[in-house]
Regions:
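Active-site-proximal substrate-binding groove within the catalytic cores of carbohydrate-active enzymes
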Residues: 36-37, 225, 236-242, 457-660, ...
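Bacterial N-terminal signal peptides that target proteins for export
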Residues: 1-10
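Bacterial N-terminal signal peptides
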Residues: 10-19
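Aromatic- and glycine-enriched glycan-recognition loops and surfaces
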Residues: 285-381, 411-415, 456-466
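Conserved beta-strand positions
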Residues: 318-321, 431, 481, 643
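Carbohydrate-recognition beta-sandwich/jelly-roll modules
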Residues: 25-317, 335, 348, 352-355, ...
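Active-site-adjacent "subsite" loops/lids of carbohydrate-active enzymes
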Residues: 340-348, 354-424, 501-517
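Active-site neighborhood of glycoside hydrolase catalytic domains
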Residues: 401-491
Length: 679
């Protein structure tokens, strides 16, 4: 039965949530409080209190129906009246007569908060707009202010490649943290005070264009350009997806378990685990090492020949730029004719059991090419009626971002990828950016998709990639892309991860999607000292990544090659976990362990090989436990611990056995890697 609430602070939906696939004790309770003005007062989880900053729960931008550049802002606190109704399952907050660009009585806003059986809450926002002039463009919702006190909380935020980083005791930052969706980064944010945590994630099965914004005192919200933004009479009434808040107990792993339970039910994961996909090219997930080159066919064949001699026990993959007639980031998508000898190089390398993987770009068209005269209408159109153009480095010509919904562009990509498969005989291809670059709002009505935001970006890529993916897999060939964009999971077979590694990285994507795709590469400066090199590469190995994306001079470093031989051999013996299994947790110690600090030098790009004056970016310093390990569930359901001694000294540690209250002792010889059965 509905009831009108009184003007008093109201605690709603006090509930207990159980973590997904969690150990004993991973449960917590969440209480959310508002005042009589519908201002969020706090969110209490266990013994911790989050989001005490008050302020507007939502803001929105509206544009003039005849001029998208003319904007006004609507804010919750400006409403003439605020009301609230409650049932056992839903709380409804209403703001009536919100001023809009000088008009009154034309805008209402409604937030519904739905209690879910698992203890989470789904928050939705919708507007009723009666203005004849102003049309909804963007929303920022829900706005949680001062989620954790300055310097008090650990904050999990999205990052490139691995998917997330953990910021310990995060303080107020001078610059806003903003990440865009449909690219590298998942839309996630987690906040922890001790072992009490708050899960803050949009659940959007359609994968609409959106941003996460965190600024100031951990003030967080999700920004959305709505469908048909600024189109009078057609603009969406709001973001059209819920943001889910849930209580957590533990650390970022409890967050990842909850997200995995959601993510694996989405359309991009519908194919299921790769072990159960009949035409999944298992050759990809069983390649343990990759090299990155910019070189012609003779260079490519020589490098893979040397790699075969140095790493005889397994295949080496080659991320191959310059197989095409022109340079990198030049003359896209006019890749053909191929360099003389490309077809023969591919056949020769494949005959050795090596994997040459040509590079193409599935997103960009070089604007100076004559072909762009005809292609320009299919590029993304900005709000100011100019085409969206990017530039990569001062020597690179402008590159236009193509709208993935346009059939002519889809046909172009199908054509050049088909020629690489059929004419060159390649068994693998790297299609750059479709899994890394974020969705871009497009305002060209000729493209036929909703203007501005919406789900059309993913839908366009899916329509483009489905026949390409089917054709390649039918021949036992595989497709990869850059980054780790989850929305491409059913469009590609794996993700090449090229971003510089950081001590704050956590293996979020591996924890969520392990067993459902292949993540490969572990970029590192080849000049790192051997101990630092071993530490980073072992971390990546135990998280489930195949290793590599090294510059070819790695082959001139016997000490690094010896380390890689050892690590890759271990991976090949544990493919049931590292390629086909599920990453469960990290090795947790029952007694203190030694730690070592390593220097990871700044990235060396390929052109630094020929530029003695190249200046490295700053180093990063990582302090890691001397013994590392991760728990995995293998493809056949066994729980195992994979662990390594990073040091040249024997190590003895006492650790907690996953899923139990037991402890055990592990003694490791110098640089030893082991597999241990779980409980």
């Amino acid at each position: 039965m509905k009831r009108q609430t009184r003007k008093a602070i109201l605690a709603i939906f006090a509930c207990t949530a159980l973590a997904i696939d969690a150990g004993a004790g991973e449960q917590n309770r969440m209480t959310v409080s508002f005042n009589e003005k519908n201002v969020l007062q706090s969110i209490t989880v266990g013994a911790a209190t989050f989001a005490t900053g008050g302020g507007d729960l939502w803001t929105a931008e509206f544009s003039d129906g005849t001029n998208r550049a003319k904007r006004v802002k609507a804010c919750a606190h400006e409403a003439a009246t605020c009301t609230r109704t409650e049932t056992d399952a839903v709380l409804t907050l209403t703001w009536r007569d919100v001023p809009l660009g000088g008009e009154r009585g034309v805008l209402d806003a409604t937030v519904t908060i739905e209690k879910r059986p698992d203890g989470s809450q789904a928050w939705n926002l919708a507007f009723a707009n009666r203005s004849p002039r102003w049309t909804l463009m963007t929303t920022a919702f829900p706005r949680l202010n001062r989620v954790t006190p300055d310097g008090a909380g650990d904050v999990l935020l999205p990052s490139n490649d691995h998917g997330a980083q953990i910021f310990r005791k995060r303080t107020v930052q001078p610059k806003p943290f903003r990440r865009a969706y449909l690219g590298y980064c998942p839309m996630i944010a987690g906040f922890f005070l001790g072992t009490d945590g708050l899960y803050f994630v949009p659940e959007d099965p359609e994968a609409r264009i959106k941003n996460l914004l965190v600024e100031g005192e951990q003030n967080a919200c999700y920004e959305t350009t709505v469908e048909n933004a600024g189109v009078p009479g057609r603009a969406a009434e709001g973001p059209r997806y819920p943001v889910v808040l849930a209580p957590l107990k533990g650390d970022w792993w409890s967050f990842a378990r909850r997200y995995r339970a959601y993510a694996l039910k989405q359309k991009w994961a519908a194919r299921g685990p790769i072990k159960d996909i009949p035409d999944y090219p298992r050759r990809l997930c069983e390649i343990p090492l990759w090299i990155n080159i910019h070189g012609y066919p003779d260079v490519a064949s020589n490098i893979l020949t040397r790699a075969k001699a140095i790493f005889p026990g397994f295949s080496t993959g080659l991320h191959w730029h310059l197989w095409q007639h022109s340079g990198h980031d030049v003359n896209y998508p006019e890749y053909f004719p191929a360099q003389p000898g490309t077809k023969e190089c591919i056949a020769y390398c494949e005959s050795m059991g090596q994997e040459p993987m040509p590079y193409v770009n599935g997103r960009l068209w070089s604007a100076p090419t004559s072909g762009f005269i005809l292609a320009e209408p299919y590029a993304v159109l900005r709000q100011n009626d100019t085409r969206y153009v990017e530039k990569y480095g001062r020597l690179t010509a402008p590159l236009a971002v193509m709208c993935p919904t346009c059939a002519p562009w889809q046909k172009v990509v199908r054509t050049f990828t088909g020629r690489i498969l059929d004419e060159l005989g390649a068994k693998s291809i790297f299609i750059d950016q479709i899994g890394a670059a974020p969705g871009v709002p497009c305002y060209d009505p000729a493209h036929g998709h909703p203007l501005g935001g919406g789900a059309w970006w993913r839908e366009g890529y899916e329509k483009m990639m489905e026949p390409i993916h089917r054709a390649w897999n039918a021949k036992g060939a595989f497709i990869t892309t850059e980054g780790s964009g989850e929305m491409c999971l059913n469009m590609v077979d794996g993700y090449l991860q090229v971003v510089v590694r950081d001590p704050k990285d956590v293996p979020f994507h591996n924890a969520v999607y392990s067993g459902y795709t292949t993540y490969f590469c572990s970029p590192e400066n080849n000049d790192d000292d051997p101990a630092a090199f071993r530490a980073l590469q072992t971390r990546e190995l135990l998280w489930g990544n195949a290793l590599g994306w090294f510059l070819p001079d790695i082959l001139d470093k016997p000490d690094k090659c010896a380390i890689l031989n050892q690590l890759c051999a271990f991976r090949q013996k544990n493919l049931d976990a590292l390629a086909y299994g599920n990453l469960l947790d990290e090795l947790r110690f029952a007694e203190p362990v030694g730690k070592t600090t390593y220097e990871w030098l700044g990235r060396r790009p390929h052109h630094s090989l020929y530029d003695p004056a190249y200046k490295l970016p700053p180093s990063k310093f990582a302090t890691l436990a001397d013994v590392r390990g991760n728990w995995w569930r293998t493809a056949d359901g066994k729980v195992v611990l994979l662990a390594a001694n990073l040091t040249d000294r024997e190590q003895r540690v006492v650790y907690r056995v996953y899923g139990t209250d037991k402890t055990a002792v592990l003694v490791l010889a110098p640089h030893e890697l082991v597999r241990i059965k779980g409980a």
